[in-house]
């Protein structure tokens, strides 16, 4: 009996092996490399720490240095209302989704709960505090790259993380209080969650993927573009590997090989069976719907926000047809100007993986990077911050290019070293130049500086604060008659008597801020009541942004008029 049982067991194992071999023959290889042997573990850990330190230093250094952009000022205004009044109502006309404001409101609310309202104002609602939100999401994106070590390779992962850490655009936008940094983080989080689902056969990974997807759609209306490109990139990767499966060989790196997926049914069984997969899918759907609902309805305070969230696509489509329109090749030109090393290395990496597709994830990353570049290029509406969407996957495939050079026949340390030194030196120079020297230079070479606020605006704010201290502090009145004034509402947030008229208006307040084009009207209407506070520029004006100059007037200290304000001459 024992021999019979043993014989049956042997036959069963052989039959199972034949079945598996036949299935493997018909399936594309999608192994994930396990590159722990590429570099010593100690080198890997030191590299991770050093890259994080470099990334944090570039992103956190002097966050007050660069004046807020127009859009940052608008976002800051929404945040102030949410923090101070607890009021936020989603409006599809108003600059994307609500997640940025709620993430940014967390710290001020904590400060108020622990130390009172004064601490909230002094330490919670500050330029440094609000810009720490994109800083943390930017660092989080780099952290996600390190989770790809088994999929990309050690050298590729470290290189990709370092390239993104010092990328001129990634650093610039990580110091920018807009939605883009957290948008790319959530996009990347979807990818990583799906990779963990595939690698570990854990259906509960559907839940973080769904949460990331909900937060992505609650951040910007362009989420459907990113998700669509990810799906297409995955499908093309699968089809391409099927077509060239005879040429695909497992990587030489040591480690546990990634299991093959014979069929959808086998995959479901490996995930725990139909019941477990269905349960996790339901939980994922509830997670997605719940987060989406909570954010767009202002945590149930504005039920109409849910229906309004679907109106945003029509608004976005209309907006994209009238403003910021650029030629189809614009993103490639901008990338060459500011992210040249990433683009060139990314192109080589894509070429390597297409010609020798031994790494499925690298192929997917190439399709993700250039797919997004193509998708956004086909849309007339183009802004530099949208490039961050494809800078991240470009960094991944650029890192793969460096590893591919390293693995050519013999270990090409010298060639790899030269490539890295040139790429990193050029990128680091551009990053420092852009972020700490020419951060407001509107020359076309500095593509990320897009209608940005000039540093002269901060001089205007300093003069306003000086006058305010000499008068009645935060109660000092300010009349703003200039039609262009953003981001001044953020910088004047602690002044309770500020009027934003956008045109000439009567005033007896201690200060008037006007556009330089309004100078004749100001002097005609206010006669000898006010004197101009001049900047260091020749005309005494303070430059707000290219083409917009502001004038500051202070009411004469010996005048405390009780009569009615003078009439305005039109």
Go through the PLM ranges and name each one.
Residues 498-509:
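Short acidic low-complexity segments
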Residues 507-570:
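Aromatic/acidic, Gly/Pro-rich catalytic loop(s) in extracytoplasmic/lumenal soluble domains
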Residues 316-317, 416-476, 481-496, 543-568:
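Membrane-proximal, lumen/periplasm-facing interface regions of secretory-pathway glyco-
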Residues 221, 474-476, 508-510:
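Loop/turn elements at helix/coil->beta-strand transitions in domains of secreted/extracellular proteins
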Residues 75, 99, 328, 456-463, ...:
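Stable alpha-helical elements in mature extracytoplasmic
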Residues 170, 372-373, 484-485, 517-520:
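Solvent-exposed loop/turn segments at secondary-structure junctions
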Residues 20, 478-482, 500, 512-514:
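Short, hydrophobic beta-strand segments that form beta-sheet elements in well-ordered domains
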Residues 2-414, 421-427, 431-434:
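Membrane-integral, polyisoprenol-dependent glycosyltransferases
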């Amino acid at each position: 009996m024992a021999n019979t049982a043993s014989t049956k067991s042997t036959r069963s194992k052989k039959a199972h092996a034949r079945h598996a071999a036949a299935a493997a023959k018909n399936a594309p290889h999608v192994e994930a490399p396990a590159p722990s042997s590429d570099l010593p573990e100690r080198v890997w850990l030191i590299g991770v720490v050093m890259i994080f330190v470099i990334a944090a230093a570039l992103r956190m250094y002097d966050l007050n240095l660069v004046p807020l952009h127009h859009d940052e000022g608008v976002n800051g205004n929404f945040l102030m209302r949410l923090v101070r009044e607890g009021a936020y109502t989603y409006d599809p006309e108003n600059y994307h989704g609500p997640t940025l404001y709620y993430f940014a409101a967390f710290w001020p609310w904590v400060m108020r709960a622990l130390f009172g309202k004064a601490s909230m104002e002094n330490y919670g609602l500050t330029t440094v505090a609000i810009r720490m939100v994109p800083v943390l999401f930017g660092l989080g994106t780099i952290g996600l790259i390190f989770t790809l070590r088994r999929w990309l390779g050690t050298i590729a992962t470290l290189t990709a993380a370092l390239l993104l850490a010092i990328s001129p655009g990634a650093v610039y936008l990580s110091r920018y209080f807009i939605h883009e940094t957290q948008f790319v983080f959530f996009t990347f989080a979807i990818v990583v969650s799906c990779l963990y689902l595939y690698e570990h056969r854990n259906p509960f990974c559907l839940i973080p993927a769904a949460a990331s997807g909900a937060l992505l759609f609650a951040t910007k209306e362009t989420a459907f573009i990113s998700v669509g490109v990810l799906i297409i990139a995955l499908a093309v990767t699968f089809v391409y590997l099927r077509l060239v499966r005879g040429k695909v060989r497992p990587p030489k790196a040591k480690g546990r090989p990634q299991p093959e997926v014979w069929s959808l049914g086998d995959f479901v069984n490996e995930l725990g069976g139909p019941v477990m997969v269905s349960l996790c899918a339901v939980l994922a759907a509830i997670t997605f719907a719940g987060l989406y609902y909570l954010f767009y309805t202002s945590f149930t305070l504005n039920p109409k926000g849910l229906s309004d969230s679907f109106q945003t696509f029509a608004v976005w489509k209309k907006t994209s047809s009238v403003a910021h329109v650029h030629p189809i090749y614009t993103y490639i030109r901008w990338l060459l100007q500011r992210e040249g090393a990433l683009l060139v290395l990314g192109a080589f990496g894509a070429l390597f993986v297409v010609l020798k597709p031994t790494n499925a994830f690298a192929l997917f990353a190439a399709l993700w990077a250039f797919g997004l570049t193509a998708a956004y290029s086909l849309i007339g509406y183009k802004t530099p911050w949208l490039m961050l969407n494809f800078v991240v996957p470009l960094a991944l495939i650029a890192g793969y290019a460096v590893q591919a050079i390293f693995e050519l026949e013999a270990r090409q340390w010298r060639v790899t070293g030269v490539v890295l030194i040139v790429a990193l030196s050029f990128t680091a120079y551009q990053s420092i130049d852009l972020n700490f020297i020419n951060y407001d230079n509107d020359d076309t070479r500095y593509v990320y500086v897009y209608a940005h606020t000039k540093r002269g605006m901060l001089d205007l704010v300093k003069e306003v604060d000086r006058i305010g201290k000499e008068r009645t502090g935060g109660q000092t009145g300010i009349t703003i008659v200039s039609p262009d004034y953003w981001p001044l509402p953020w910088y004047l947030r602690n002044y309770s008597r500020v009027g934003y008229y956008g045109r000439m208006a009567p005033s007896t307040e201690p200060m008037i801020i006007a556009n330089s084009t309004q100078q004749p009207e100001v002097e005609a209407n206010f006669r000898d009541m006010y004197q101009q506070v001049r900047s260091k520029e020749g005309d005494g004006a303070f430059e707000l942004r290219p083409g917009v100059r502001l004038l500051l007037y202070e009411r004469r200290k010996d005048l405390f008029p009780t009569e009615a304000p003078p009439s305005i001459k039109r």
